[in-house]
Amino acid sequence: MASTWAFEAQGPGSIPGGGASYTSFMSLETVVVLAAGEGTRMKSTTPKVLHEISGRTLLGHVLHAVSGLKSKNLCIVVGAGREHVEAHVAQIAPHAITVFQEHRGGTGHATQLALAGTSSLGTSSQGTVLVLAGDTPMLTGASLEALLDVHHKGKFAASVMTAEHPDPTGYGRIIRSADGSFLRIVEERDASDEEKAIYEVNSGVYAFDGVKLAAAIGKLKNDNSQGELYLTDVLEILRNDGGSIAAVLIEDFIEILGVNDRAQLAESAALLRDLINDNLMKAGVTIVDPISTWVDSTATVESDVTLLPGTWIAGSTKVASGAIIGPRSTLLNCTVASGAQVIESHCTGAVIGANANVGPFTYLRPGTQLGASSKAGAFVEMKNAVVGDGSKVPHLSYVGDATIGEGSNIGAATVFVNYDGVEKHHTTVGDHVRIGSDSMLVAPITIGDGAYTAAGSVITEDVPPGAIGVARAKQRNVLGWVLRKRSGTQSADAASRHDDGKKG
C-alpha cells in the first residue's frame, strides 16, 4: 500500500517548518473550477454561481482566489444557465475556457470533461491540476498556496484540503489511520455513527499530479446510489496504484463553506462582512457598528475613515483617509477624497472631492463630480454634473447635465431643465455665480462669471458675466379679493378683522 500523509497549514500560506515557497507553482498546469451545479435549492432563475455577495458573484470570488496562482490553463465546467455563466466568465476571466456538462454526472465526470477540454487545446498532462468548486466564496488564495506548496514539495499523487467543521453534517469525513495518515473520504450517507462523529471534513479542493490523474480518472465507476462519478474515488484509485496522498488541514473552516440555498448565501455574506470589517478596523478604519456596515471585497477604504451605522461601501468605491461616511449611506463605484463627508445619501458612480459635503438625503448619479470643499445638500439630485471647488447646491435642487464653476451658489429649489422631451442639453454656470431660489435654468444656456439670477426666474437665454437675469411677471395685488371671492372662510374672517382694526 502506498504511503499517505497528513499536514496542517499553520496559517494562510504556511506549512509546518516555515513559510511557504511558491516558486514551484510554475508547475501548476491547470485549474479546474466546477460550476455546473443546478442549484435547485436556490429556487432562482439565476444560476447558483452567479448569485452575488460582497461585490462579486460566488464564481467571481473563487476566480479571484485562484488568480494569483498563475496557472497555465483555467477551465470552468458549466451546466445550468450555461449562456449566462459563460458570458460572466468572458467578462471577468477572458483567458479561461469553458466546457459544458450537459447531464449531471458528478464531480468525477465534470473533471473528465475539463481534462478533455484542455487536452483538445494541446495542453500537456504534465504538472499539477487543481480542482475546486465554484460556490465557495470564502476560499483564499493563501490557503490554495499552502495546499500546492505541500503537494509540490512532497511530490504527492494527490493532496486534499481539509478543515475541522463544528457541524460536519452533510460533508464527507476524513478518515485517518492511527498515526494520523490520510486513509480515505467517507461520504455522509455512507458513514457509520463513529465516522459521523469526526469533525474533519473534505473541502472539495484537490491538487493532483496531472499524469496520474489522467490515468486514474478513466477508472471511475458510477456504481453508487446517485449513479455518478465521484472525484473523491480518484484518491482511492491513486492509493491502490501506489500513489501517496496528502491531507492538508487549513486553519479556518469558513473557507470551505459552500452555498446551496439563500440561507447559506446570507450566512456567507455575513461571514465575509465580518472578516472584511475586522481587517479594516485593524488597519485603522473606525466602524461604529460593524453589524450594519457592509464593505464589498472590491472596495478600498483607507485608514482614519469613519463608517457610521447603516453604510454600504459597494463595488469599486475608494474612500480616502479622513472621510466620514454615513449614517445610512450607499456608495457604489464612487471615489471619495480625503476629508469628505457623506450623510444619509445614495451615490452611484460619483467623484466626491476633498472636504466636500454631501447630504442628508442626496442622490448622486453617474457622472457627478464634486470639487474640493463643494456641497450637495439636503434633497439634491445630481446627474452628469461637474461642480467646481467651493461651489454649493445646498438644498431641494436638481442638477443634470451641467458644469458649475468655482465659488458659485445655487439657490434652493433650482432646477436645471435639461430635457426637451427628445434630447438632453447642457447648462454652464460660471465662477462665483449666484442663482436665486426657485430658478428654472432651461438648457442649453450659459450663466456667465459673476452673474446673478433673480429668485423665481425661468431663464431661457444666456446671462452675460456680471449681469442679473430676471424672468418673471410683475407682481399685481388685487385688493379685497378674498372678501369678495372667499366670503365665510377663515381667511375672509381674518381679513375682515384686520380691516375692522384699521377702522377702529
Feature-to-residue mapping (PLM):
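Conserved core of the sugar-phosphate nucleotidyltransferase
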Residues: 83, 139-225, 232
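Conserved N-terminal catalytic core of the sugar/cofactor nucleotidyltransferase
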Residues: 22-30, 56-145, 149, 153, ...
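Acidic, glycine-rich loop-and-beta core segments that form the ion-binding/anion-interacting portion
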Residues: 299-368
